[in-house]
From Swiss-Prot:
The lineage of its organism: Bacteria, Pseudomonadati, Pseudomonadota, Alphaproteobacteria, Rickettsiales. NAD(+) binds at residues 8-13, 78-80, 102-105. It is an enzyme of class 1 (oxidoreductase). One of its GO terms (molecular function) is oxidoreductase activity, acting on CH or CH2 groups, NAD or NADP as acceptor. It comes from Rickettsia peacockii (strain Rustic). This is 4-hydroxy-tetrahydrodipicolinate reductase. InterPro entries: DapB_C, DapB_N, DapB_N_CS, DHDPR_bac, NAD(P)-bd_dom_sf. (S)-2,3,4,5-tetrahydrodipicolinate binds at residues 135, 144-145. It catalyses: (S)-2,3,4,5-tetrahydrodipicolinate + NAD(+) + H2O = (2S,4S)-4-hydroxy-2,3,4,5-tetrahydrodipicolinate + NADH + H(+); (S)-2,3,4,5-tetrahydrodipicolinate + NADP(+) + H2O = (2S,4S)-4-hydroxy-2,3,4,5-tetrahydrodipicolinate + NADPH + H(+). The active site is at 134 (proton donor/acceptor), 138 (proton donor).
């Protein structure tokens, strides 16, 4: 039986994972950590877990990683809003532990990223813009998924990523990200390739959080026999 520790257990993603875990055989939620806990509780939390699924806040990541290293606990990180210093921590931890990070764990969003990469090879001279839409209460902007998509495309085309263009003209070597917040929209990401004569748009819409939670649980199971490295969901889906 795979013992999964769930960090952020009282958040929306945590609650969805708790609802979906019974759909999977040979794994269970063995430990929980949430905002009511003290950071030192992460010690026993990691000790009692084979792998941790983390949907909490960036502020606890360093402590979580330290205790995971202490107890050799594998990590699946889905927390968004991470900064460069957090990614350095993940890269360092991945030298000792198998670590999987993804801003979006649904197969649809990762397929969108793959398709965007393939389209970019063909539409090399098209302008690229990303529009992401989420519910009114989402804290981070742009979304982690939008940044993931932009980085995928930018790396292939040698573009700079622009979050807030304001009133300046669009430069030739950039990809822009625009954000909408409102209503109870779960997640919509659109990538537009804009040419002089036509526009091609790739779109993914999540109707609920189920696809994210299922992806996270699959990631925890998949990670069990993997060597130390930093993985993504595209390693699981082989895309």
């Amino acid at each position: 039986m795979l013992n999964i520790g769930l960090s952020g257990s009282t958040g929306k993603m945590g609650e969805t994972i708790l609802e979906r875990i019974d759909k999977f055989k040979d794994c269970k939620i063995a430990a929980k950590f949430n905002s009511t806990n003290n950071l030192d509780d992460l010690d026993n939390f990691c000790k009692n877990s084979d792998v941790i699924i983390d949907f909490s806040t960036p502020e606890i990541l360093e402590k979580l990683i330290n205790y995971a290293l202490k107890h050799n606990t594998k990590l699946v990180i889905g927390t968004t809003g991470l900064q460069p210093q957090h990614f350095k921590l993940l890269e360092k931890a991945a030298q000792t532990l198998p670590v999987l990070y993804s801003a979006n764990m649904s197969i649809g969003a990762n397929l969108l990223s793959y398709l965007a990469k393939e389209v970019t090879k063909i539409l090399d001279d098209y302008d690229v813009e990303i529009l992401e839409t989420h519910h009114r209460n989402k804290k981070d902007s742009p979304s982690g998924t939008a940044v993931m998509l932009a980085e995928t495309i930018a790396s292939k085309k040698g573009l700079n990523i622009t979050f807030n263009r304001g009133n300046r003209l669009r430069s030739e070597k950039e990809i822009g990200i625009s954000s909408l917040r409102g209503g109870n929209v779960h997640s919509i990401h659109e990538i537009s390739f804009l040419g002089d004569d036509e526009i091609i748009t790739l779109k993914h819409e999540a109707l609920n959080k189920n696809s994210f939670s299922i992806g996270a649980i699959k990631a925890a199971i998949w990670l069990q026999d993997k060597p130390s490295a930093l993985y993504s969901m595209q390693d699981i889906y082989k895309i």
